[in-house]
Amino acid sequence: MMLTIALSKGKMLDLTLEVFRRAGYAMGSFSTASRRLVFPCPEIGMTFLIVRPTDVPTYVEYGAVDVGIVGKDVLMEQDSDVYEPLDLGFGACRIAVAALKGQASRDRLSSKIRVATKYPKITERYFNQRGVAVEIIKLYGSIELAPLVGLADRIVDLVETGNTLKAHNLVEVECIAQSTARLVVNRASLKLKHAEVTELITKLRAVSRVATGSRATAPCEPSRGVRRTGKRTRT
């Protein structure tokens, strides 16, 4: 049976294709230079769809596709009802809280603070767990600008190297979670196409172990303690 797979467009796409090729899937008809969004590959029993990363869980949950490849950050934010059997190991980033340099340790968490982010649900859960009242400002890009123009006290964003934060005079206050590419499966497809899905998981897991063992990770840094008191935790 043919598997339909949603791939995240953007910089994760090339890494995803490389993993599939290492797993032995010949994708001759696939071209990232094409404007096409649907790529049938009958020679390997798969059809690929190129979609926005934030749409991948929706396509999978509602059965428009059988399988998807998407970052853990998107899954945490959307909390979709999908089966997540495999961490592919690439695309390592971290979801982090950041603030202007010199203001990171300022005692401003005793009252309501503004936080700009494209991850409102993750942000709300994080600060609620710490008893900090927040006003969340949803942005769709260039999150680093928010503290520079006084729009927000903090930001929650995806960080890979930290260079973008440094370029905007921001420092990482605390890491919320790590994010890597994940394989997710529609729950009905897992039953109806069990053999095909299991074979895909097995092959990708084999090459992902190699990749995971040698990849440059983006680990969570030691916590600086975002707390109501605004004090840092000693390390």
What is the meaning of each model-derived region?
Residues M1-T235:
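Domain-level signature for soluble enzymes in the chorismate/prephenate branch of the shikimate pathway
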